[in-house]
Amino acid sequence: MSSGISKTAKGKRGRPSLQQVLQQLDEEVSLLKTSMGGLPRAVEANAILHEIWIDDVHNSTAIEGNTMTRAQVEELVERGRASASLVEMLEVDGYAEVADWVYRHAADYQGVPVTVVSEAHRRAVELVWAKQPPASRDQPGAWRKTPVQVGKVVVSVPAAIPAELDAWSASTRDPKGRHPVVHAAVHHAWFERIHPFVDGNGRVGRLVLNFMLLQHGYPPAVIAKARRPRYLHGLALADDGNVNVLAEVIARAVSGTLTRFLVPALAGEARLVPLSALAARGPYSSAYLRLLVFDGKLKAVPDGNLWLSSKKWLQEYMRDRDPRGHKSLSKRRKKK
């Protein structure tokens, strides 16, 4: 089987290729492992994982049409109440429960057993289906017994689902030389083509995607609702054998989890982190920080394709500037 990356794929002008995106992601993950001890375990970093979890629950359910805001999702999972419809709250509750389990237990498995897929679906939809059962009367966690039409995609016929899921599950355990993100992308698209349930395949598919990523030492991919069109485009291209766009969407989502949540939370003020992580919790964009580095105004050190700086060095730069970005009067006077 091929690597899953199209040999003809090249980055458009001004847009990095998939290989470049994966290389940068691996450098970020390597930095996390070597400088910060790797991914925090749930018992060690509940606060960090909690923020990722909320973001994951909100965006993954929103991709499927749930209209609850992130603030409403947070209020529901933390306090058990929110101003939203009952069905939408049940959707969020179900997904939140399974995502929490995935974060804590993915590393306990090798690959994705079909029993995990079935149990993830059962937990994700049973409350919703108790209130609003599907017309087919399928049961939560059970493979569908009726044909479905999913746009122009040809999905598995019901009789073929058990055997195809067995083959899919066995394949999740063997990357076959693929990059872990590409391996996860290939199996995410494959799972959606099998479409084993009458409803809930998208949510379960993204849970399984993160299950695989976590097994390989990557943080969860939180695919933002705003990225839905490109994500669906990537799935459509993957159905035709080109997984590049889908893998890029996933890689960028993983990188976003790193730079927005993990690295800023784990890094002390003197810890060197990528400029993107420094920008995630600061007043400047990563592009502006890069300009400051090239101008010699912000201390930084190169590390492969990345530039690393620290909160401490950024604070030193900011102390040397007034709010308008000019050097302070006291500093100018000292130079006279």
Regions found by a protein language model. Name each.
Residues 1-199, 203-336:
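FIC/Doc superfamily catalytic core
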